Design a protein with these regions (language model features):
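Non-catalytic extracellular/periplasmic "stalk"
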Residues: 1-65, 69
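Catalytic cores of peptidoglycan-degrading enzymes
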Residues: 59-186
């Protein structure tokens, strides 16, 4: 038997101030909305199609500087919330967002925290999610080639300005997208 120990990792912290306090401490009506939306998103994250991913070496969905890394501990208005589940790229509103690999659109929506959002199934439990979009340019069921435009960068949902949030889920576990990007090193 081989064993191993998983050690603790200290992630950097990010402190964000939001004017809309509902985005930090939602009222009961918004909590119900968030719960409904989370159920939809969990279903998307748990999608497993038999298609083999076209490539696990992914393109960046946008070209621009990284503004927030995966795993960053987040504090909104001084209150700790979930760690950052993806990568944020600081790019201007309206910048086209391209799918990093071929896939099928499995969910779109306008969500409380994520704003306009698109989920793409790349196959075998490998899912991309793009958030805070100003415009969604795809429909559920649409097949996309690598580099296909899913929408435009925006600042919808819990966002302090235009940026592109991208996360990867592998069999319903959020993983750092940076490990799948060619020569990109955050």
């Amino acid at each position: 038997n081989l064993g191993f120990t998983v050690g603790n990792k200290k992630y950097p912290e990010q402190r964000i101030t939001l004017k809309n306090t509902q985005q930090v401490n939602p009222d009961p009506e918004n909590l119900k909305r968030i719960e409904r939306e989370l159920a939809e998103q969990i279903t998307a994250y748990r999608t497993f199609s038999p298609n083999t991913p076209s490539n696990l070496l992914l393109d960046k969905p946008v070209n621009g500087p990284l503004s927030s890394k995966f795993g960053v501990r987040r504090f909104f208005n001084g209150e700790e919330r979930n760690p950052h589940s993806g990568l944020d790229f600081a790019v201007g509103a309206g910048t086209p967002i391209k799918t990093p690999a071929a896939g099928k659109v499995i969910l779109i929506g306008n969500y409380f925290f994520n704003g306009n959002t698109v989920f793409v199934d790349h196959g075998q439990g490998f899912i991309s999610m793009f958030c805070h979009m100003s415009k969604i340019d795809v429909k559920v069921g649409q097949q996309l080639a690598r580099g296909g435009v899913v929408g435009k960068v925006g600042a919808t949902g819990r966002a302090t300005g235009p940026h592109m949030h991208w996360n990867i889920s592998l069999n319903d576990a959020r993983v750092d997208p940076a490990i799948f990007i060619g020569a990109f090193q955050p």
